[in-house]
Amino acid sequence: MVVARRARRPLAASTANHSRPRILVVQSCPVTPAGIVGQVAEARADVATIFPHGGEPLPRTTAGLDGLIILGGPMHAGDDVNCPAFRALLPLIRRCHAQGKPVFGICLGAQLIARAFGKPVYPYGGVEVGYLPVQLTEAAAEDRLLAGLAIEQHIMQMHEDSFDLPDGAVLLMRNDTCANQAFRLGATTYGFQFHLEVTEADAGNFPRDCWAALQRHFGSAAEAEEARVLAEVERHFAEGETFCRTVTARWLDLVEEARAERRRRAA
């Protein structure tokens, strides 16, 4: 699957004369677009997508930026040799967090948030793939993004790595296979290990997009695993889409609130 690049809109200028928030999407891989998260965000914000591993530079400051979304990809979050753009992305994550500009990390994006705050990212010893059950923790009941949602959700997974939680982070979702599934750091920085963003078409393409990982872990059973995943897409996609749209909309509430507060202070 090839995803066409969007025209990049500059984010360096002040947001003072713009009626909608500005959100930067960092896309590391063409087969992991913003999907449903992007659809929800574009309805309420001006969204610019950049491809840093294709040579597009990341902004050096957060000027003109109201929120940051970091998407997934097959690369390892610690691979600065093959992914040198990570060196510029980590300080951008820290700056957004320090300034109260909401951050939303998906899979690799969540791992990069953990790394930005000094925590290791590592192979957890297996692979999670398919619409697998994930449980909300008790802390999620008081969280702005997750309060009131069903305790168990089935959401698309495709990862081999995990991470340690940043100091002070609150664990919001977990499962028995890989404990750290979702967390909040501070009030507005969120990491999600799973792929809540996938459209139905992208979810159906995941097994082939990640075929090498399936063969590595399942060998001759890889085709059976592919069939399982495709059946789970049909069974659980609607549930996952509802979860994604709800969580993304609530995160955008945080973006709008933080932006309004900055404008109030600057007035």
Positions of PLM-derived features:
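N-terminal beta1-alpha1 cap of cysteine-dependent amidohydrolase-like domains
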Residues: M1-K101, S220-A267
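Hydrophobic/aromatic beta-strand patches that form the interior of the parallel beta-sheet core
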Residues: L24, I50, I69, F104, ...
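Short loop/helix-cap segments at secondary-structure boundaries that form the rim of catalytic
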Residues: G38, L58-A63, I113-A114, D164-P166, ...
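Tryptophan-centric aromatic hotspots in well-structured domains and transmembrane helices
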Residues: V40-A41, Y131-P133, M158, F206, ...
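Glycine-rich, phosphate-binding/catalytic loops in enzymes
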Residues: V40-A43, P84-A88, V121-Y122, R174, ...
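Cysteine-nucleophile active-site neighborhood
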Residues: I70-A140
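Pocket-forming structural segment of enzyme catalytic cores
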Residues: F117-A203
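C-terminal helical/coil "lid" or tail adjacent to the Rossmann-like core of SAM-dependent
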Residues: T188, Q193, E197-V233
